Amino acid sequence: MIYHQFPCRLKKVSLSTVKRKDLFMKTLYVSDLDGTLLRKNETLSPYTIKTINALTSSGMLFSYATARSLNTAKKVTEGLNTHFPLIIYNGAFVKDNITEEILIANYFEEDVYEVLKDLFAHEIYPIIYSYQNDIEKFSYIPAKATSGMLAFLNSRKGDKRTNIVTTESELMYGNLFYITCIDKPEKLQPFYHKYKNK
C-alpha cells in the first residue's frame, strides 16, 4: 500500500480530487509488487490499474521495487502506465522501463565465488543470474536441481534467459548479480545465517 504523504490508502483515493498536474511532483511513490500491489493470483486488479494510471496521468511519480526480473515484473503489471525507472532483482538493477537500459547495476564482488564453492561443497546448486556477453541469463544444472527448483523453472518455460549448464564453472560464468537457492529449510538455514550480513 502507498502511505507516504498521502491522507489515505490507495484504495480510498477519490479520483475527483486529483486535478493539478503538479500535485505529486515532489514525491516519488515506490511500491512492492508481491503481497502489495499484486493479488494472490499474481495479477493487478482493474481498480488498481485504473487508480494508478489516473494518478500518474495527473502527475504523480510512481514506480515499483521487486525481487522479480524485469521480464516477469512487466508480465504481472501489464496495463500499468509506469514510465519511471524500475528497481528489480531486490535492487541489483535499476532499469529504464521503456528502453530497458540498465541505469544502475550492482554485481557481486569476487568473494561470491567462495560462497558458491561453499554451497557446492554441501550439495547446494543454485540458479545463478548473470550477464554473459551483455545478455541476461539464468543458469542451472538440471542434474542437481531440487524438486522446488524444477517447479520454479517450470513456471519460466520458454524464457529466453534460460541457460542450461553441466559444470560448476559454467554455472559461475559471467557477471553474477543474483543467486536463488531452493531446497529444504534445514539444508539452507545454516547458510542463510552464515551469509545474511555479507
Segments (PLM) and residue ranges:
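Conserved acidic, metal-coordinating active-site core of Asp-based
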Residues: 122-124, 129-198
